[in-house]
Design a protein with these regions (language model features):
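Conserved, well-folded catalytic cores of nucleic-acid-processing
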Residues: 46, 50, 72, 91-95, ...
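Phosphate-binding loop that captures ATP/GTP phosphates
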Residues: 75-126, 138
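Phosphate-binding/switch loop-helix module in NTP-utilizing enzymes
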Residues: 123-171, 190
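Conserved catalytic-core segment of NTP-binding enzymes
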Residues: 29, 154-155, 161-215
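Short glycine/serine/threonine-rich phosphate/pyrophosphate-binding segments
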Residues: 56-64, 85-89, 160-168, 189-193
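Extreme N-terminal, non-catalytic leader segments
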Residues: 2, 9-51
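Residue-level signature of catalytic and energy-coupling elements of molecular machines
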Residues: 43, 54, 80, 88, ...
Length: 215
């Protein structure tokens, strides 16, 4: 399992650790990449769940956080942005497929009332392989935001694939992210990535951050 989780509100450290691509684009150019959400959805906060490598418990953290927020009375949704390796539906006990109406794609709900969209819920068989190149995958991630009827949500958690490839880049460029959760494991190399992010946030003067170490 992971041994630490860092939560940093994105809007407070955007100028400091927003990613390598922000250094090459000004604010106006960045805004031009943002896509409009579903016209019938009202999402108050979008939180990205990220990790430097796979197998550190990122999706487990996503599900646990979603369940905790739901238990507190918040309306929660999960976007499984790991298009080629989706795991959220099975972890949340979802087997039914998505439906569609005049408002968009309707995501199924878990037993806790958490709305979930995932490529597995759109495939005919969940075991079917998704063999697509980066641009196609990135486009699907955007469609999960623009074409899905989320309704009213307090939190939309975006479970991303590990690393800094096409999907995380697309999410940070195209969606109005409010915060991120960085998930790491006991290995020193992985923990180093998160510690660097934490130190950068601290140097940037961010007050809304937390560090948790599990024994």
């Amino acid at each position: 399992m992971y041994n630490c989780v860092i939560i940093i509100w994105y809007e407070l450290f955007e100028s400091n650790i927003g990613g390598f691509w922000r250094k090459m684009m000004n604010a106006d150019v960045k805004k031009s990449f943002l896509v409009n959400g579903n016209a019938f959805s009202d999402i108050k906060r979008i939180i990205g769940i990220v990790s430097g490598k796979g197998g550190v418990g990122k999706s487990t953290v996503t599900c646990a956080l979603a369940r905790r927020l739901a238990s507190m009375g918040y309306k929660v949704g999960i976007m499984d942005a790991d298009i080629t390796g989706p795991s959220i539906p099975r972890m949340m006990g979802i087997a039914e497929r998505c439906e569609e109406n005049d408002k968009g794609i309707v995501p199924p709900c878990s037993a806790e009332g958490i709305k979930i969209i995932s490529m597995n819920l759109l495939l005919k068989n969940e075991d079917d392989a998704v063999i697509w190149r980066g641009p196609v995958i990135a486009n699907w991630v955007k469609q999960f935001y623009t074409d899905v009827y989320w309704g009213e949500l307090d939190f939309l958690l975006v479970d991303m694939p590990p690393g800094t490839g096409d999907v995380p880049l697309t999410v940070f460029q195209s969606l109005p992210i409010d915060g991120i959760v960085l998930v790491t494991s006991p290995q020193s190399l992985v923990s180093m990535i998160v510690k660097k992010a934490y130190n950068m946030a601290a140097n940037g003067g961010s007050d809304e951050r937390s560090y948790r170490r599990n024994s």
